[in-house]
């Protein structure tokens, strides 16, 4: 079964806001699952507040990014661009350990797979894109999230090292299905 997520690219003064995930200590755009009774836009605004502490105004629909294959269920992420309109930067215990703005030309290398394309699209004012992101991993190497966290905790590596060694090495094939630069 596929899931749906709302992702937010908060852009302010030539910088983009990223969060560092607690589970693998890599950077990504804020966002998360759409809850029952909630629209995609409402989910984006809620997730921005929960994960960053900011109140945001959505300014543009960047696109839809469909992650297929990989370890868990397929996920369709809808990316909105936004601007901050209130609040203050904070982390969300259990989900984020750091929140920071990055200059467009100084993005962190340690990013969650697939988010590089999303960040670049948001920065370049892309609108209306549909991207299929295929994560190719061996069929026998698809542990559940719980099993993956256990492997991480038993590995002797830092959370980031585990992610970079095990997950980020998977091949990601990105296919622009609609729109683009």
Regions found by a protein language model. Name each.
Residues 12-50:
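Conserved Nudix-box catalytic region and its N-terminal flanking loop in Nudix hydrolases
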Residues 66-88, 116-127:
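Active-site-adjacent beta-strand/loop module that shapes the phosphate/pyrophosphate-binding cleft
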Residues 2, 72-74, 93-96:
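A generic structural micro-feature
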Residues 25-26, 94-181:
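Nudix hydrolase/Nudix homology domain
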């Amino acid at each position: 079964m596929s899931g749906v997520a709302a992702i937010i690219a908060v852009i302010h003064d030539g910088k983009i806001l990223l969060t560092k995930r607690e589970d693998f200590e890599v950077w990504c755009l804020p966002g998360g699952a759409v809850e029952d009774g909630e629209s995609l836009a409402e989910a984006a605004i809620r997730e921005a507040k929960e994960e960053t502490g900011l109140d945001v105004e959505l300014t543009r629909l960047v696109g839809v990014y469909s992650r297929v294959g990989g370890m868990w269920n397929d996920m369709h992420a809808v990316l909105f661009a936004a601007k901050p309109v209130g609040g203050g930067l904070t982390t969300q215990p259990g989900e984020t350990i750091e929140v920071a703005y990055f200059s467009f030309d100084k993005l962190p290398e340690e990013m969650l797979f697939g988010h590089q394309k999303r960040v670049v699209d948001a920065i370049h004012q892309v609108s209306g894109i549909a991207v299929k992101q295929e994560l190719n991993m061996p069929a026998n190497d698809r542990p559940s999230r719980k099993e993956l966290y256990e492997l991480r905790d038993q590995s002797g590596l830092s959370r980031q090292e585990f992610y970079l060694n095990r997950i980020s090495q998977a091949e990601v094939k990105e296919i622009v299905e609609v729109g683009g630069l």
